[in-house]
Amino acid sequence: MDLTLVGQLISLFAVVAAGPLVIVFLSARRGAL
């Protein structure tokens, strides 16, 4: 399997997963949750 393709998929998944996680993390730090 092409490592470049794997790297792109991992990067894409990381960006998609990090978005909501960052929002939840910031909300939790503010005591919103």
Curated annotation (Swiss-Prot):
Entry-linked Pfam families: PSII_Ycf12
Recorded superkingdom: Eukaryota
Alphabetized InterPro entries for the sequence: PSII_Ycf12_core-subunit
One GO CC term on file: chloroplast thylakoid membrane
Any single biological process term in GO: photosynthesis
Keywords: Chloroplast, Membrane, Photosynthesis, Photosystem II, Plastid, Thylakoid, Transmembrane, Transmembrane helix
TM spans (from-to): 5-25
Bilayer topology annotation: Single-pass membrane protein
Location in or out of the cell: Plastid, Chloroplast thylakoid membrane
Translocase found in the keyword field: no
Family per similarity comment: Belongs to the Psb30/Ycf12 family.
Task performed by this protein: A core subunit of photosystem II (PSII), probably helps stabilize the reaction center.
Subunit (UniProt): PSII is composed of 1 copy each of membrane proteins PsbA, PsbB, PsbC, PsbD, PsbE, PsbF, PsbH, PsbI, PsbJ, PsbK, PsbL, PsbM, PsbT, PsbX, PsbY, PsbZ, Psb30/Ycf12, peripheral proteins of the oxygen-evolving complex and a large number of cofactors. It forms dimeric complexes.
Descriptive protein name: Photosystem II reaction center protein Psb30
Species name: Nephroselmis olivacea
Lineage of producing organism: Eukaryota, Viridiplantae, Chlorophyta, Nephroselmidophyceae, Nephroselmidales
